[in-house]
Amino acid sequence: DTPLGFFATPVNYDWRLLAGPSYGQYATRIWDSYLFHTVPYYSQHKDDIEYDQFNQLGTQASLGCIRLLVCDVKWIYDNCPIGTRVVIYDNADDPGPMGKPGTIYTDPADESKRGWDPTDPDSANPWDAAFRSGTAIRSEAAWNEWNDAQNDGRWNGSINPTDLQGWSTDSSVEGTRG
C-alpha cells in the first residue's frame, strides 16, 4: 500500500529500474522504496511503455508507488527540488485543489501509438499535441477550484499540516495511484 503521511523527496532519476523488471521515467523518490513515476516501460525508451499497464492508471496496480502520466511526473521532476515536502493522504470525497484528472486510454491494437504515453512532450510522440500540454484532461471546474483555493488562502504555495486540516485528500493521488 502507498504510505500516508508527510515526506520530503530525497532523490530523483531520469529513469529508474522498477520491479518486474521494468523502468519508470522521471521518477522521484517519496520515501523508502516508494516513488512517483510513470507507467512502467519495458526498456529505457519513450516509445516502449507497457501499454496494457497504461490503461490501469487510476487503479491500484503496483506495490505502492504512485504512477502518473508523463506530463504530471515530469512536472514534479522539473519543478520540485530535492527536499520538496510531499503529503499523501486518503479522502476520496475531496479531490483536492486540482481535482481528479480525467482518464486517457490507449488502444492496444494501435501499434503506431500504443508504446507512447499520450502526454509525453517528446517531439517524436505520435499523439495529438493537446494531450502533451498537461492540461487537456483537467476540468474547468478543477481549475476554478484551484484558483479559488489560491485566492481564499487554502493554498499559498507552501504546504504544512495546519494548511491541510479539514481540506486535504489524496484523491489527487488516488486517481493515478498504482
Walk through the language-model features, giving the residues of each.
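Exported/periplasmic cell-wall-interacting domains
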Residues: 6, 13-178
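Electropositive
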Residues: 1-8
